[in-house]
Amino acid sequence: MSPASPMSEIRHDWQVDEILELMGRPFNDLLFAAHTVHRAHFDPNAVQVSTLLSIKTGACPEDCGYCPQSAHHEVELERERLLPLEEVLEAARNARSHGASRFCMGAAWRNPTDRNLERVIEMVEGVKQLGLETCMTLGMLTDAQARRLKDAGLDYYNHNLDTSPEFYGQVITTRTYQDRLETLAHVREAGINVCSGGILGMGESRRDRARLLQQLANLPRHPESVPINNLVQVEGTPLAGTEALDPFEFVRTIATARILMPASYVRLSAGRTEMHDELQALCFFAGANSIFYGDKLLTTPNPGENHDRALFERLGIHPLEHSDEGASCETCGGVDIHAA
């Protein structure tokens, strides 16, 4: 395969051996290729900033091996019922005042009931009135539920694939890979932007990481947002004690995601507290251009806002303004015009 070009065609037919060849290139060659692609589609010094709030915490019936919110695991976690609307809106106002352009809300459910969906819709409508983009992660959705969220004004829906189809069963048994793909299809068909990525460092192989990216890049449309999480090990979960991923392997995965999905936002998600500033800077160079802002992500720690602000200043990076988020589209070879 020839080196990546700024005008390279956006593809949906990647083969795993091609992806492994990319991942295995000399580190500097891979980062140069990824950065070249990144510059063709985005301002390399702008990072989209989101804030994430847990609107319902704990007691989830799923058995995801990485998650402290699972009812299957012995974890010290204070369970919380669905938050009142005004508490959610106050958190959204605070996020807006600190520079967030998107407000993400997560509930520890297998899937929302119709009653809970009514309350969630009120949250979407209220946050939209504050001038923020909205994102939800509520578990699996039916096509009808996805359409209702779209009608309420939901901009993004997060539903991660987590890992490769082959490794998936070693992490989760209560929800199938196909269940996840079907929810993504319902979200896309409803006209909601898709946010979908995975978690690295769960004991998977490089091939598993390549297969995860292959699944995402070969969807009929690339996810507008691709969150890449570095496993946060929580005592009491089955994955506590897993050998940590080589940081360079994490950067390689970020770079490969950028090449495979040139017009998508690639987000550094959970696990940034374990990353030195230098590692985050490498990730930004390799094509990461989105972060979660705030001291906590659902139930796991996140770098403080002051730390992120200082890091941005040191790197000459600035938060992406809401009005500037129409940075890239899949149909326009190079720098382009539609919201991503």
UniProtKB/Swiss-Prot annotation:
Cofactor(s) this protein cannot do without: [4Fe-4S] cluster; [2Fe-2S] cluster
EC top class, as a word: transferase
EC number: 2.8.1.6
Residues bound to [2Fe-2S] cluster: C104, C135, C195, R267
CDD domains named in the record: Radical_SAM
Keyword set includes Methyltransferase: no
Pathway(s) it belongs to: Cofactor biosynthesis; biotin biosynthesis; biotin from 7,8-diaminononanoate: step 2/2
GO biological process: biotin biosynthetic process
Binding residue positions for [4Fe-4S] cluster: C60, C64, C67
Domain of life: Bacteria
Xref: InterPro entries: Aldolase_TIM (IPR013785), BATS_dom (IPR010722), Biotin_synth/BioAB (IPR002684), Biotin_synthase (IPR024177), Elp3/MiaA/NifB-like_rSAM (IPR006638), rSAM (IPR007197)
One Pfam assignment: Radical_SAM
Repeat listed as a keyword: no
Cofactor descriptive note: Binds 1 [4Fe-4S] cluster. The cluster is coordinated with 3 cysteines and an exchangeable S-adenosyl-L-methionine. Binds 1 [2Fe-2S] cluster. The cluster is coordinated with 3 cysteines and 1 arginine.
GO molecular function: 2 iron, 2 sulfur cluster binding; 4 iron, 4 sulfur cluster binding; biotin synthase activity; iron ion binding
Annotated keywords: 2Fe-2S, 4Fe-4S, Biotin biosynthesis, Iron, Iron-sulfur, Metal-binding, S-adenosyl-L-methionine, Transferase
Segments forming domain Radical SAM core: 45-272
Catalytic activity: (4R,5S)-dethiobiotin + (sulfur carrier)-SH + 2 reduced [2Fe-2S]-[ferredoxin] + 2 S-adenosyl-L-methionine = (sulfur carrier)-H + biotin + 2 5'-deoxyadenosine + 2 L-methionine + 2 oxidized [2Fe-2S]-[ferredoxin]
UniProt cross-references to PROSITE patterns, sorted A to Z: RADICAL_SAM
Subunit record text: Homodimer.
Family annotation (NCBIfam families): bioB
Similarity comment: family membership: Belongs to the radical SAM superfamily. Biotin synthase family.
Function: Catalyzes the conversion of dethiobiotin (DTB) to biotin by the insertion of a sulfur atom into dethiobiotin via a radical-based mechanism.
Protein name per Swiss-Prot or TrEMBL: Biotin synthase
Species per Swiss-Prot/TrEMBL record: Thioalkalivibrio sulfidiphilus (strain HL-EbGR7)
Encoding gene, per UniProt annotation: bioB
